[in-house]
């Protein structure tokens, strides 16, 4: 996921970043092992996304490195929270349609929780990974959470396509991208005409 953020300009990677975690989550392994994988994924992502903190020239090297590590360690627990909530709902054997709506909603909720209070980190918002795609990022102007929702939905659809080998999921994946791009084009056209 970290590579999908600027300055790398690989925003499309955000559409797939959860897929390995979904495979791990659905394996027959202990919850504690799943938590470790989610934590490592979060830590790695934040280590890449916030690399600039360690390079902060406005402070000493020690403070910059400690701040950098603290960010990576602390915010990775939100990925653990996501894993725990998935585990809770996974025991309920929800339908595919409910999962398609609930899992993105959970991610959006967690990102919103992360952005509250003095430790808020809006620069970690996954919507920022789409800044290189003018048409796709426009949905943020309607509501920032829609972009997050669509990113997680794309991950779920592609995961379901790979794991279940049903074409309806890849068609849905492509449709979500096209609809998002169409909405973006309409918003850009409306902005340019005013």
Language-model features: where?
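Membrane-embedded alpha-helical bundles of multi-pass enzymes
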Residues: 1-194
